[in-house]
Amino acid sequence: MTRKKTNPFVAHHLLAKIEKVNMKEEKETIVTWSRASSILPAMVGHTIAIHNGKEHIPIYITNPMVGRKLGEFVPTRHFTSYESARKDTKSRR
């Protein structure tokens, strides 16, 4: 039994904002919390500020990004290195 491919998910409010900006033909930053939305060809050339849990990170959408999710381009975790702790223990010896 063959399966039908589903359409990519895009939040309705984000799609409406993209269409409105495309009609105006102005470049403005679009703010969104929808990290699960897929990137469509209509979004190419726009700057979208994507929420990472703390703040909005502006990302410029290019052609190779089409088909991927918005959340893939904004990291949510910050890695802290333990190098300074290791250097302190070596100096005490």
Curated annotation (Swiss-Prot):
One of its GO terms (molecular function) is structural constituent of ribosome. InterPro entries: Ribosomal_uS19, Ribosomal_uS19_bac-type, Ribosomal_uS19_CS, Ribosomal_uS19_SF. Its main location: plastid. Disulfide bonds: none annotated. GO terms for biological process: ribosomal small subunit assembly; translation. It is found in: Plastid, Chloroplast. Keywords: Chloroplast, Plastid, Ribonucleoprotein, Ribosomal protein, RNA-binding, rRNA-binding. Coiled coil: none annotated. It comes from the Eukaryota. Pfam families: Ribosomal_S19. One of its GO terms (cellular component) is mitochondrial small ribosomal subunit. NCBIfam families: rpsS_bact. Belongs to the universal ribosomal protein uS19 family. Protein S19 forms a complex with S13 that binds strongly to the 16S ribosomal RNA. This is Small ribosomal subunit protein uS19c.
